[in-house]
Design a protein with these regions (language model features):
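N-terminal secretory signal peptides and thylakoid transit peptides that target proteins
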Residues: 1-16
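Active-site pre-lysine segment of PLP-dependent enzymes
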Residues: 153-162, 178-198, 202-215
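Phosphate-binding glycine-rich loop
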Residues: 79-118
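Short hydrophobic alpha-helical segments of the AMP-binding
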Residues: 84, 133, 192
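N-terminal "arm"/small-domain region of PLP-dependent enzymes with the aminotransferase-like
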Residues: 15-71
Length: 215
């Protein structure tokens, strides 16, 4: 107990020494409050949420679907896949829907871990889905972002090992918001050995002026 009190005294003295102006940096960020009404409060950037809520058309569609919500939506899912394929100019067989992108990321991780090995990921980036990787037999190779907080694609190429199964790229990157140019990313993918999965997460691509790699 005495050690804890001594530690608290030292910390308190250190904070006082910083001055009143700098004490503001110790206040709790508003984004820690998950129950805030985003209509009246700042946008919660950390959660990839729509601050405006569902559009009027979406609300009508949801209301109309309540009476059939006790049934599996096979038909609706097929229609959604067809529309996604049409928008991205790809075959519908290349579309997989899931309960959020994390489920799909998990599936790719499971597939990559089938033969064990390693995977390459930037630091920092969105890595919540990678936590089970070691239990699945995949070792993590972290590549720091460059001085501009962008992906160091050359360093990622150099980090490839003989047992590398997967390379993950979040574009635009979460949490830095930086983006890899389309041509640079295409060239990078072409340089990666064909036996390695390059997983490009474009969760935020619609917030940029850059065209998605899907079309």
């Amino acid at each position: 107990m005495s050690n804890r009190r001594n530690w608290l005294k030292k910390v308190s003295l250190g904070i006082v020494g910083l001055g009143v102006g700098q004490l503001e940096t110790f206040s709790n960020p508003i984004t820690d409050n998950y129950d805030l009404n985003t209509v009246d409060f700042p946008i919660l950037l950390r959660s990839n949420e729509n601050p405006y809520g569902p559009s009027p058309l979406a609300r009508v569609a949801m209301a109309e679907s309540v009476n059939i919500s006790n049934r599996y939506g096979w038909k609706t899912t097929s229609e959604l896949i067809s529309e996604i394929a049409k928008r991205n100019i790809v075959n519908s067989n290349n579309i997989l829907t899931a309960a959020g992108s994390t489920e799909i990321l998990d599936l790719v991780l499971l597939f990559a871990a089938h033969e064990k090995g390693s995977f390459i990921i930037a630091n920092p980036t969105y890595d919540y889905w990678t936590y089970p990787s070691e239990k699945l037999g995949l070792s993590r190779i972290s590549v720091p972002l460059d001085a501009n907080k962008k992906y160091d694609l050359s360093a990622m190429l150099n980090a490839i090992k003989s047992d590398t199964r997967l390379i993950y790229i979040c574009n635009p990157n979460n949490p830095t918001g930086t983006i890899c140019k389309r041509d640079e990313l295409v060239n990078f993918i072409n340089e990666v050995p064909k036996n390695i999965i390059v997983l490009v997460d474009e969760a935020y691509i619609d917030f940029t002026r850059q065209q998605s790699l899907t079309n």
